[in-house]
Curated annotation (Swiss-Prot):
Gene3D superfamilies linked to this entry: 6.10.250.1080
Gene behind this protein: Nde1
Region (Interaction with PAFAH1B1): 88-156
Tissues in which the UniProt entry reports expression: Highly expressed in ovary. Also expressed in brain, heart, kidney, large intestine, liver, lung, small intestine and testis.
Other comments on record: Homozygous loss of this protein results in microcephaly that preferentially affects the cerebral cortex. Affected animals have a smaller cortex with reduced superficial cortical layers, although cortical lamination is mostly preserved. The smaller cortex size seems to reflect both reduced progenitor cell division and altered specification of cell fates following progenitor cell division.
Originating species: Mus musculus (Mouse)
Protein name per the record: Nuclear distribution protein nudE homolog 1
Low complexity bias (residue ranges): 324-336
A GO term, aspect molecular function: identical protein binding
C-alpha cells in the first residue's frame, strides 16, 4: 500500500526497486519453506520418539501389572501361613499357660509345707533375721532416696543458672538487634546494603532468639551450658570496647546467640520430658513395704538410732514433684532414676 504511492525518477529505478523487492520476498519465502521443512522433520522425529517411549511405557506397565499380581498372590499365601502359625502359637501358649498354672500350684503347696516345717523349728530366729534384713533394706532405700533428692536439687540449681543465662542471652540478643538496626541506619547512605544471604541469616538469627520455649530447662553438665554464655559475653565486651563491629560480625554474633538459644531450648524439652516421666511414675508408688516394716518395728524389735535421723533427713530433703511428703520410696524409683539419667 505504501509502495503504490511512491514516485520514481525513472523507469529503470522503478524496475530495480520492484526487482529487489521481489527478490526479498522470494528469499523470505524460501527461508520460510526451509524452516517449515525443518519443523516437519523435527516434528516427525519427535513423534517417532514419543511413540517409542509410549511403547516402552506400555511394556513397563504390563510388566508392573504382572509383578503386582504376583506379589498379591504371594501376599495371600503369606497371610494364610501367618494365620496358621498364629493359631498354632496360640494353642501352644494356652498349653504352656495351663502347665504354668499347675506348676505354680505345686510350688505353692511345697512352699507352704516348707514354711510350716521351718516355723515349727526356728520361728524366733527367722523373725529376728527377717526384721534385721527388712531394716537394712529400708535404710538402703532411704539412702537411695536421699541421694536421688540431692541429685534433683543439684539439677534445680543448674536449671536456675540456665534460666539466668537464657535471660542474659535474650537481653544481649535484643541489644545486638538494636545496635544492628542503628548501625544499618547510619551506614545506609554510605555503604551498600548486605547481600541477600546476610539478610537471610539475620532473619534466621532474630527468629531463633525470639522462639525460646518457656519450660524449665535441663542441663547436661556444669561445663557445657554455663561457661559458653560467659565466654560469649566477655567476647562481646572486648569487641565493643575497641573498634565498632561490622555488620557481618554482628550477624555472626546473632547467629551464635541463636544457636545457643536453640541448644537451651532442646535442654528445656528434655528436662520437661523427664519431669513428665517422674509425674507418670509417682502415682504407682505405694507405702506397702514401708508400712509392713514399721509394724514389725512396733511389734517388739528395737529400732536403730541411725534410722530415725536418716528418715528425718530424707523427709527434709524430699522435693515436691506431685508426691506427698510422707510417702516413702518404692522399688520402682531406682528404675525411674536410671531412665532420667539416660535421658539426661
Amino acid at each position: 500500500m505504501e509502495d503504490s504511492g511512491k514516485t520514481f525518477e525513472s523507469e529503470e529505478e522503478e524496475t530495480n526497486y520492484w526487482r529487489d523487492l521481489a527478490m526479498t520476498y522470494k528469499q523470505r519465502a524460501e527461508n520460510t519453506q526451509e524452516e517449515l521443512r525443518e519443523f516437519q522433520e523435527g516434528s516427525r522425529e519427535y513423534e517417532a520418539e514419543l511413540e517409542a517411549q509410549l511403547q516402552q511405557i506400555e511394556t513397563r506397565n504390563r510388566d508392573l501389572l504382572s509383578e503386582n499380581n504376583r506379589l498379591r498372590m504371594e501376599l495371600e499365601s503369606v497371610k494364610e501361613k501367618f494365620e496358621m502359625q498364629h493359631s498354632e502359637g496360640y494353642r501352644q501358649i494356652s498349653a504352656l499357660e495351663d502347665d504354668l498354672a499347675q506348676t505354680k500350684a505345686i510350688k505353692d503347696q511345697l512352699q507352704k509345707y516348707i514354711r510350716e516345717l521351718e516355723q515349727a523349728n526356728d520361728d524366733l530366729e527367722r523373725a529376728k533375721r527377717a526384721t534385721i534384713m527388712s531394716l537394712e533394706d529400708f535404710e538402703q532405700r532411704l539412702n537411695q532416696a536421699i541421694e536421688r533428692n540431692a541429685f534433683l536439687e543439684s539439677e534445680l540449681d543448674e536449671k536456675e543458672n540456665l534460666l539466668e543465662s537464657v535471660q542474659r542471652l535474650k537481653d544481649e540478643a535484643r541489644d545486638l538487634r538494636q545496635e544492628l538496626a542503628v548501625q544499618q541506619k547510619q551506614d545506609k547512605p554510605r555503604t551498600p546494603m548486605p547481600g541477600s544471604g546476610q539478610a537471610k541469616r539475620t532473619d534466621m538469627a532474630v527468629q531463633a532468639t525470639g522462639s525460646v520455649p518457656s519450660t524449665p530447662v535441663a542441663h547436661r553438665g556444669p561445663s557445657s551450658g554455663l561457661n559458653t554464655p560467659g565466654m560469649f559475653r566477655r567476647g562481646l565486651d572486648s569487641s565493643t570496647s575497641g573498634t565498632p563491629l561490622t555488620p557481618a560480625a554482628r550477624i555472626s554474633a546473632l547467629n551464635i546467640v541463636g544457636d545457643l538459644l536453640r541448644k537451651v531450648g532442646a535442654l528445656e524439652s528434655k528436662l520437661a520430658s523427664c519431669r513428665n516421666f517422674m509425674y507418670d511414675q509417682s502415682p504407682s508408688r505405694t507405702s506397702g513395704p514401708a508400712s509392713g516394716r514399721g509394724t514389725k518395728n512396733r511389734d517388739g524389735v528395737d529400732r536403730r538410732p541411725g534410722s530415725t535421723s536418716v528418715g528425718d533427713k530424707g523427709s527434709g530433703k524430699r522435693l515436691e514433684f506431685g508426691k506427698p511428703a510422707s510417702e516413702p520410696a518404692s522399688p520402682a524409683l531406682p528404675s525411674a532414676q536410671g531412665v532420667v539419667k539416660l535421658l539426661l
